[in-house]
Amino acid sequence: STYAIFLPGRCVDQIRNSIAYPSRGEKKGLNVKLVTSHGGLSVGPDGGSHQTIEDIAIMRVIPNMRVIIPADAIAVSKLTKNISQIYGPFYMRMARSKVPTIHSDSQEFEIGKGITLRDGNDCTIAATGITVKMALDAADKLQQDGISCRVIDCFTIKPIDKDILEKAA
């Protein structure tokens, strides 16, 4: 595990050529799990040189790479177990700071499937990682103004859950 700014930014050619490209029959890519922390703009005192948003874009375009961004410790634990049981390359990005618990212990996580955390009729906020809590807070504020907002945790960025997003549109 390392900072999200460094792994994709400095190692993209090794990740692409040595992890994602090799295939053996039906198996695409090697069975490597890449985990980073300090993702996004939430690195606190580590400063601007450690902030990144482009890591997601870099990893999404690599063939055979799957990208997940858990919202809380429960999601991290369950998704770590899930990806350990699925062959192929994965990129998991986590935040630096402690995040509030959003999911219950009984929540199931399926790679490629988002989770509707709150139903709503007027608008939808699809979020990932630490922004899921921000989306729930925004939905609470909108509710005070009579706006019913659906919130979706899109913890799988690649493959994205097109079905849940199309239903919400």
Stretches with model-predicted labels:
Residues 1-124, 149:
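Conserved thiamine diphosphate
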Residues 4, 38, 129-131, 155:
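Residue-level signal for short, function-critical loop segments
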Residues 12-13, 135-136, 162:
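Conserved strand-to-helix beginnings and helix N-cap segments that scaffold or border functional pockets
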Residues 73-76, 155-161:
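Short acidic loop-to-helix transition motifs that present clustered carboxylates
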Residues 98-99, 131-133, 156-159:
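Short, catalytically relevant binding-site loops at active-site mouths
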Residues 118-121, 126-128, 133-140:
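Hydrophobic pocket-lining "lid/loop/helix" segments that shape and contact the acyl-thioester
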Residues 134-152:
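Short helix-loop-beta junction
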Residues 159-169:
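Glycine-rich, anion-gripping cofactor-binding loops and their flanking helix/strand elements
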